[in-house]
A protein has these predicted regions:
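Short, solvent-exposed beta-strand-terminating loops
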Residues: 1-3, 40-76
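Active-site beta->alpha N-cap acidic-glycine motif
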Residues: 1-50, 120-121
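Aromatic- and acidic-residue-enriched carbohydrate-binding clefts of CAZyme catalytic domains
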Residues: 8-13, 59-89
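Acidic-and-aromatic substrate-binding clefts and catalytic sites of carbohydrate-active enzymes
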Residues: 16-24, 52, 117-129, 148-157, ...
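Acidic (Asp/Glu)-rich catalytic clusters
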Residues: 22-43, 58-67, 136, 165-169, ...
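Structural preference for beta-strand elements that scaffold enzyme active sites
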Residues: 37-41, 116-118, 140-141, 173-175
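Catalytic domains of cell-wall/extracellular-matrix polysaccharide-remodeling enzymes
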Residues: 88-161
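Catalytic grooves of carbohydrate-active enzymes
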Residues: 95, 102, 106-118, 175-200
Length: 200
C-alpha cells in the first residue's frame, strides 16, 4: 500500500508461524534456554538493510519484486540479499540504526525475559557509533570476526578494524572473536568442516 516507501518489521515469532513445520520452534528454543542448551544473543531487529532493499523495489527491479511477492530473499547483482543491516550509504543513517537497535533490544528483553549481554552485527559490519546504545541497553560483549568492517558509505567497501579476544574498547565493551568462520550458505561446494578445523 505504501509503494515501498515505508518499511514495516514483523516480530520473528509471527514469521515462524508462517513457515511450514516451524510453529513449535519458539517453544523449543524456550526449552533449550531453560535447559541451558543455548543462550540467544541480539543480532538485530531485522537482518536487512531495508533502505537499499526498498530502493531496488521502488525502482521496479523485476527479480526483486518477484522475490518480494513470493516471500523470499533476493540475491541479485551487487548487494548480497541486503543483509548487512548496519551498513550505511549516508553517515546520518547511523542515528536511525541507533533507534532500531534500542527498539530491537527492548523487543529482545520482552520476548526472552532478559537483556542480551552480547551483540553480533549482521554480516559483521557496524559503525562504532552504535556501540553506545548497545552498552546503555545492557550489552557487554561485541562478537565478530578478527576484523570489524566499518561502513564507508559504499556497499562492500569497508574500513577494517582488527580486534582480539578480550580486547576492551573505550566504552568498556569487550570483544569476543570467533575462532573460525562457518557460513556454508555462502559457498555450498566448499569443505567447511576442514576449513573450520584449519582455522582453529
Amino acid at each position: 500500500a505504501s509503494n515501498f516507501t515505508k518499511f514495516y518489521f514483523e516480530d520473528f515469532r509471527e514469521t515462524l508461524q508462517k513457515y511450514p513445520a516451524h510453529d513449535k520452534a519458539f517453544s523449543i528454543w524456550q526449552q533449550g534456554i531453560t535447559n541451558g542448551v543455548f543462550m540467544p544473543q541480539f543480532h538485530g531487529r531485522e537482518h536487512l538493510q531495508y533502505k537499499r532493499w526498498l530502493k531496488v523495489l521502488q525502482a521496479g527491479n523485476k527479480d526483486a519484486l518477484y522475490c518480494f511477492d513470493h516471500g523470499t530473499t533476493y540475491s541479485g547483482k551487487g548487494d548480497y540479499s541486503f543483509m548487512e543491516a548496519y551498513d550505511w550509504d549516508h553517515p546520518g543513517d547511523v542515528e536511525e540504526h541507533k533507534k532500531i537497535i534500542a527498539e530491537g533490544l527492548f523487543l529482545f528483553k520482552n520476548v526472552f525475559g532478559f537483556a542480551s549481554k552480547s551483540f553480533i552485527a549482521p554480516c559483521y559490519n557496524w559503525d562504532p557509533e552504535i556501540e553506545g546504545v548497545l552498552k546503555s541497553n545492557g550489552v557487554r560483549w561485541l562478537q565478530g570476526l578478527r576484523n570489524q568492517m566499518v561502513p564507508t558509505g559504499s556497499f562492500d567497501h569497508y574500513t577494517i578494524l582488527p580486534h582480539y579476544f578480550g580486547e576492551v574498547n573505550q566504552l568498556g565493551l569487550k570483544y569476543n572473536i570467533r575462532n573460525c568462520f562457518l557460513e556454508p550458505s555462502l559457498l555450498p561446494g566448499k569443505d567447511w568442516v576442514d576449513s573450520c578445523l584449519a582455522q582453529i
